[in-house]
Protein backbone atom coordinates (compact mmCIF):
# COMPACT_ATOMS: atom_id res chain seq x y z
CA UNK A 1 0.00 0.00 0.00
CA UNK A 2 1.53 3.33 -1.04
CA UNK A 3 1.32 6.56 0.94
CA UNK A 4 -1.35 7.90 -1.43
CA UNK A 5 -3.56 4.87 -0.75
CA UNK A 6 -3.45 5.26 3.05
CA UNK A 7 -6.72 6.03 4.75
CA UNK A 8 -7.87 5.00 8.21
CA UNK A 9 -10.77 3.02 6.71
CA UNK A 10 -8.26 0.93 4.73
CA UNK A 11 -6.22 -0.02 7.80
CA UNK A 12 -6.50 -3.83 8.29
CA UNK A 13 -7.44 -5.33 11.63
CA UNK A 14 -7.93 -8.79 13.09
CA UNK A 15 -11.58 -9.76 13.30
CA UNK A 16 -11.05 -13.14 14.93
CA UNK A 17 -8.63 -16.00 15.49
CA UNK A 18 -9.98 -19.55 15.68
CA UNK A 19 -7.79 -22.17 17.37
CA UNK A 20 -8.95 -25.72 16.62
CA UNK A 21 -7.89 -29.17 17.76
CA UNK A 22 -9.33 -32.15 15.91
CA UNK A 23 -9.05 -35.28 18.03
CA UNK A 24 -11.40 -37.57 16.10
CA UNK A 25 -13.04 -39.06 19.18
CA UNK A 26 -14.68 -38.05 22.42
CA UNK A 27 -13.85 -39.11 25.94
CA UNK A 28 -10.51 -38.66 27.69
CA UNK A 29 -8.58 -37.62 24.57
CA UNK A 30 -11.02 -34.80 23.87
CA UNK A 31 -11.00 -33.69 27.52
CA UNK A 32 -7.18 -33.49 27.42
CA UNK A 33 -7.32 -31.46 24.20
CA UNK A 34 -9.85 -29.06 25.76
CA UNK A 35 -7.59 -28.56 28.79
CA UNK A 36 -4.59 -27.82 26.56
CA UNK A 37 -6.58 -25.33 24.48
CA UNK A 38 -7.78 -23.53 27.60
CA UNK A 39 -4.20 -23.31 28.96
CA UNK A 40 -2.79 -21.98 25.68
CA UNK A 41 -5.55 -19.44 24.94
CA UNK A 42 -6.79 -18.59 28.43
CA UNK A 43 -10.38 -19.02 27.30
CA UNK A 44 -12.95 -21.80 27.62
CA UNK A 45 -13.20 -24.12 24.61
CA UNK A 46 -16.27 -25.36 22.75
CA UNK A 47 -16.69 -28.89 21.44
CA UNK A 48 -17.05 -29.43 17.70
CA UNK A 49 -19.50 -32.02 16.44
CA UNK A 50 -19.11 -34.29 13.41
CA UNK A 51 -21.36 -33.30 10.54
CA UNK A 52 -21.56 -36.71 8.92
CA UNK A 53 -20.72 -40.31 9.69
CA UNK A 54 -17.51 -41.95 8.50
CA UNK A 55 -17.07 -45.69 8.87
CA UNK A 56 -13.40 -45.44 7.96
CA UNK A 57 -12.69 -43.29 11.01
CA UNK A 58 -15.34 -44.87 13.25
CA UNK A 59 -17.18 -41.58 13.72
CA UNK A 60 -20.94 -41.23 13.93
CA UNK A 61 -22.94 -38.13 13.04
CA UNK A 62 -23.41 -35.72 15.95
CA UNK A 63 -20.49 -37.15 17.92
CA UNK A 64 -17.94 -34.73 19.49
CA UNK A 65 -14.67 -34.93 17.55
CA UNK A 66 -12.72 -31.80 18.51
CA UNK A 67 -12.56 -28.51 20.35
CA UNK A 68 -12.14 -24.89 19.31
CA UNK A 69 -11.70 -21.43 20.78
CA UNK A 70 -12.58 -18.15 19.06
CA UNK A 71 -10.46 -15.19 20.13
CA UNK A 72 -11.31 -11.56 19.36
CA UNK A 73 -9.77 -8.19 20.20
CA UNK A 74 -6.71 -7.94 22.43
CA UNK A 75 -6.71 -11.64 23.34
CA UNK A 76 -6.43 -12.52 19.63
CA UNK A 77 -3.45 -10.18 19.21
CA UNK A 78 -1.75 -11.56 22.34
CA UNK A 79 -2.22 -15.12 21.12
CA UNK A 80 -0.80 -14.31 17.68
CA UNK A 81 2.24 -12.67 19.27
CA UNK A 82 3.13 -16.04 20.81
CA UNK A 83 1.91 -18.31 17.99
CA UNK A 84 3.30 -16.59 14.87
CA UNK A 85 7.00 -16.94 15.80
CA UNK A 86 6.40 -20.70 16.14
CA UNK A 87 4.73 -21.02 12.73
CA UNK A 88 6.31 -21.07 9.28
CA UNK A 89 4.13 -18.73 7.24
CA UNK A 90 4.22 -18.67 3.46
CA UNK A 91 2.25 -16.67 0.91
CA UNK A 92 0.38 -19.86 -0.03
CA UNK A 93 -1.13 -19.86 3.51
CA UNK A 94 -3.16 -16.76 2.57
CA UNK A 95 -6.43 -16.86 0.61
CA UNK A 96 -7.53 -14.26 -1.96
CA UNK A 97 -9.33 -12.16 0.67
CA UNK A 98 -6.37 -11.93 3.06
CA UNK A 99 -7.34 -14.60 5.59
CA UNK A 100 -4.70 -17.14 6.51
CA UNK A 101 -4.14 -20.26 8.53
CA UNK A 102 -1.28 -22.31 9.88
CA UNK A 103 -0.73 -25.43 11.93
CA UNK A 104 1.34 -26.12 15.02
CA UNK A 105 2.43 -29.76 15.07
CA UNK A 106 3.07 -30.00 18.80
CA UNK A 107 1.39 -27.99 21.54
CA UNK A 108 4.66 -28.19 23.49
CA UNK A 109 6.17 -25.58 21.13
CA UNK A 110 4.27 -22.87 23.03
CA UNK A 111 6.38 -21.30 25.80
CA UNK A 112 3.75 -22.01 28.49
CA UNK A 113 3.54 -25.74 27.68
CA UNK A 114 5.81 -28.61 28.68
CA UNK A 115 5.72 -32.25 27.67
CA UNK A 116 3.68 -34.42 30.02
CA UNK A 117 3.65 -38.19 29.32
CA UNK A 118 0.18 -38.42 30.91
CA UNK A 119 -1.24 -36.05 28.27
CA UNK A 120 0.85 -36.76 25.17
CA UNK A 121 1.34 -34.44 22.22
CA UNK A 122 -1.45 -32.67 20.35
CA UNK A 123 -1.37 -30.49 17.25
CA UNK A 124 -3.62 -27.55 16.55
CA UNK A 125 -4.79 -25.39 13.66
CA UNK A 126 -5.00 -21.60 13.75
CA UNK A 127 -7.16 -19.59 11.34
CA UNK A 128 -6.96 -15.79 11.24
CA UNK A 129 -9.65 -13.58 9.72
CA UNK A 130 -8.49 -10.10 8.64
CA UNK A 131 -10.94 -7.32 7.76
CA UNK A 132 -11.06 -3.61 7.13
CA UNK A 133 -13.47 -1.16 8.78
CA UNK A 134 -16.78 -1.28 6.95
CA UNK A 135 -16.94 -5.06 6.49
CA UNK A 136 -20.04 -5.18 8.71
CA UNK A 137 -22.01 -3.88 5.71
CA UNK A 138 -21.73 -7.38 4.24
CA UNK A 139 -22.83 -9.23 7.40
CA UNK A 140 -25.67 -7.07 8.72
CA UNK A 141 -29.30 -8.19 8.34
CA UNK A 142 -30.84 -5.03 6.92
CA UNK A 143 -29.55 -3.49 3.71
CA UNK A 144 -26.55 -5.79 3.44
CA UNK A 145 -24.32 -5.05 0.46
CA UNK A 146 -21.19 -6.42 -1.14
CA UNK A 147 -17.83 -4.95 -0.28
CA UNK A 148 -16.44 -3.03 -3.28
CA UNK A 149 -13.46 -4.74 -4.89
CA UNK A 150 -11.27 -1.69 -4.22
CA UNK A 151 -11.90 -2.07 -0.46
CA UNK A 152 -11.38 -5.84 -0.19
CA UNK A 153 -8.26 -7.24 1.45
CA UNK A 154 -5.63 -8.70 -0.87
CA UNK A 155 -2.84 -11.15 -0.16
CA UNK A 156 -0.25 -8.37 -0.43
CA UNK A 157 -2.13 -6.16 2.07
CA UNK A 158 -2.47 -9.05 4.53
CA UNK A 159 1.20 -10.05 4.26
CA UNK A 160 2.34 -6.44 4.76
CA UNK A 161 0.05 -6.08 7.80
CA UNK A 162 1.28 -9.30 9.44
CA UNK A 163 4.96 -8.55 8.77
CA UNK A 164 4.74 -5.00 10.13
CA UNK A 165 2.49 -5.72 13.13
CA UNK A 166 4.01 -8.97 14.42
CA UNK A 167 7.60 -8.68 13.14
CA UNK A 168 7.62 -12.06 11.36
CA UNK A 169 8.82 -13.08 7.91
CA UNK A 170 6.34 -14.48 5.38
CA UNK A 171 8.13 -16.73 2.88
CA UNK A 172 7.40 -16.48 -0.84
Swiss-Prot record:
Belongs to the universal ribosomal protein uL5 family. Part of the 50S ribosomal subunit; contacts the 5S rRNA and probably tRNA. Forms a bridge to the 30S subunit in the 70S ribosome. This is Large ribosomal subunit protein uL5. Transmembrane segments: none annotated. One of its GO terms (biological process) is translation. This is one of the proteins that bind and probably mediate the attachment of the 5S RNA into the large ribosomal subunit, where it forms part of the central protuberance. In the 70S ribosome it contacts protein S13 of the 30S subunit (bridge B1b), connecting the 2 subunits; this bridge is implicated in subunit movement. May contact the P site tRNA; the 5S rRNA and some of its associated proteins might help stabilize positioning of ribosome-bound tRNAs. One of its GO terms (molecular function) is tRNA binding. GO terms for cellular component: ribonucleoprotein complex; ribosome. Pfam families: Ribosomal_L5, Ribosomal_L5_C. The keyword tRNA-binding applies. Keywords: Ribonucleoprotein, Ribosomal protein, RNA-binding, rRNA-binding, tRNA-binding. It comes from Haloferax volcanii (strain ATCC 29605 / DSM 3757 / JCM 8879 / NBRC 14742 / NCIMB 2012 / VKM B-1768 / DS2). The keyword rRNA-binding applies. SUPFAM superfamilies: RL5-like.
Amino acid sequence: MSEADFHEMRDPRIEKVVVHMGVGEGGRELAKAEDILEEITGQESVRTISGRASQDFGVRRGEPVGAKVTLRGDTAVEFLETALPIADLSVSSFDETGNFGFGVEEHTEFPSQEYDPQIGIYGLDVTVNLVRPGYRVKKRDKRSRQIPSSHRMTVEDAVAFIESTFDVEVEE
